[in-house]
C-alpha cells in the first residue's frame, strides 16, 4: 500500500511571531505561533514545522518557551529548527516537546554533527534542512547550490550530492527549500525536488513557492516528494488543510 503523503504547515517565527517573507525578505506578520499551530492541529495537518528564522543569523537559541507552549497544544508531530548547533540544543528542544529537530547551517560547518545527533537520538528525529538555489544557466546541466544563514551565504556545495551525504550520515529526512521560489507562490522548483527525491531513500519534504493546491499535488506527483510544506496559503486563509487534502486525494494521492 502506498504511504500517505503528508501536508505540513510551516511557521516561520521571528521574535515570537509567525511571519512570511518573499525569497527570505520583505517580512509580514501572520500572528501568534501557538494559536496558529492549534488551528492547524484542529484542521488535521499531518505535522507542523516551526522554524526560528532569526536564530542562525543572530546566533540566538530557538525559543524553548514557545516550543513548550506549542507542544502542550498540538498533538501531531512537531519539527523545530533554527540555530541548532549542539547535541545539547537538540536535547533541549526534544525535552521541550519537539518530535524532530531540523539542522541547517550547523550541518554545513560540521557534517559529523548530523551523524553524532543521529547516533544519539535516532535518525527518525533528525531532519536536515537544505536551502538550495539554482546556479546553472540556460542550456547547462541543472545544478543547485546550498546556501546557509537564512539563505544569505553561498557554500559552493552541490545540493544533490550534499543531500546524499546527509542521508549517509544518518539524517532521517530532508527539508528542501528552493530559495528561487520561496514566497513567490508560483510552485515548487520541481527540478531540484525531483533530483533530490530520486537520489535518496529517505523522505524529502518540498518547500518554497506554494501558491495554490495544484502546486502541492505537483510536489508529490512531479517532484516525487514524500511531503509538502506550505506557509502563506494556510496562514492568510486562502486554503485550509482539509481543502488541500481533498484536492490531493482528487489527484489520486494517498493522504491521511
Curated annotation (Swiss-Prot):
GO CC annotations, alphabetized: cytoplasm
Write the Enzyme Commission number(s) for this entry.
4.3.2.10
| SUPFAM superfamilies on file | Ribulose-phoshate binding barrel
Q: Give the enzyme's main class according to its UniProt record, as a single word.
A: lyase
The source's domain of life comes to Bacteria
Q: What are the protein's UniProt keywords?
A: Amino-acid biosynthesis, Cytoplasm, Histidine biosynthesis, Lyase
User: What family is this?
Assistant: Belongs to the HisA/HisF family.
**Protein's job:** IGPS catalyzes the conversion of PRFAR and glutamine to IGP, AICAR and glutamate. The HisF subunit catalyzes the cyclization activity that produces IGP and AICAR from PRFAR using the ammonia provided by the HisH subunit.
The entry's protein name is Imidazole glycerol phosphate synthase subunit HisF
Where does this protein come from, organism-wise?
Pseudomonas putida (strain GB-1)
Amino acid at each position: 500500500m502506498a504511504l500517505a503523503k503528508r501536508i505540513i504547515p510551516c511557521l516561520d517565527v521571528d521574535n515570537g511571531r509567525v511571519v512570511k517573507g518573499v525569497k527570505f525578505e520583505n517580512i509580514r506578520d501572520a500572528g501568534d505561533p501557538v494559536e496558529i499551530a492549534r488551528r492547524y492541529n484542529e484542521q488535521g495537518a499531518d505535522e507542523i514545522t516551526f522554524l526560528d528564522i532569526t536564530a542562525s543569523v543572530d546566533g540566538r537559541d530557538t525559543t524553548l518557551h514557545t516550543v513548550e507552549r506549542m507542544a502542550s497544544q498540538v498533538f501531531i508531530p512537531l519539527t523545530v529548527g533554527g540555530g541548532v548547533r549542539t547535541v545539547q540544543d537538540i536535547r533541549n528542544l526534544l525535552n521541550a516537546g519537539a518530535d524532530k529537530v531540523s539542522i541547517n547551517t550547523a550541518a554545513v560547518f560540521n557534517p559529523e554533527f548530523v551523524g553524532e545527533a543521529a547516533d544519539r537520538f535516532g535518525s527518525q528525529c533528525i531532519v536536515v534542512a537544505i536551502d538550495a538555489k539554482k546556479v546553472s544557466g540556460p542550456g547547462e546541466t541543472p545544478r543547485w547550490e546550498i546556501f546557509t544563514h537564512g539563505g544569505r551565504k553561498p557554500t559552493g556545495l552541490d545540493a544533490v550530492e550534499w543531500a546524499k551525504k546527509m542521508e549517509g550520515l544518518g539524517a532521517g529526512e530532508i527539508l528542501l527549500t528552493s530559495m528561487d521560489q520561496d514566497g513567490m507562490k508560483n510552485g515548487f522548483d520541481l527540478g531540484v525536488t525531483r533530483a533530490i527525491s530520486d537520489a535518496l531513500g529517505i523522505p524529502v519534504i518540498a518547500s518554497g513557492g506554494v501558491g495554490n493546491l495544484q502546486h502541492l499535488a505537483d510536489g508529490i506527483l512531479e517532484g516525487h516528494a514524500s511531503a509538502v510544506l506550505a506557509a502563506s496559503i494556510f496562514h492568510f486563509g486562502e486554503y485550509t488543510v482539509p481543502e488541500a487534502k481533498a484536492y490531493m486525494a482528487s489527484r489520486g494521492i494517498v493522504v491521511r
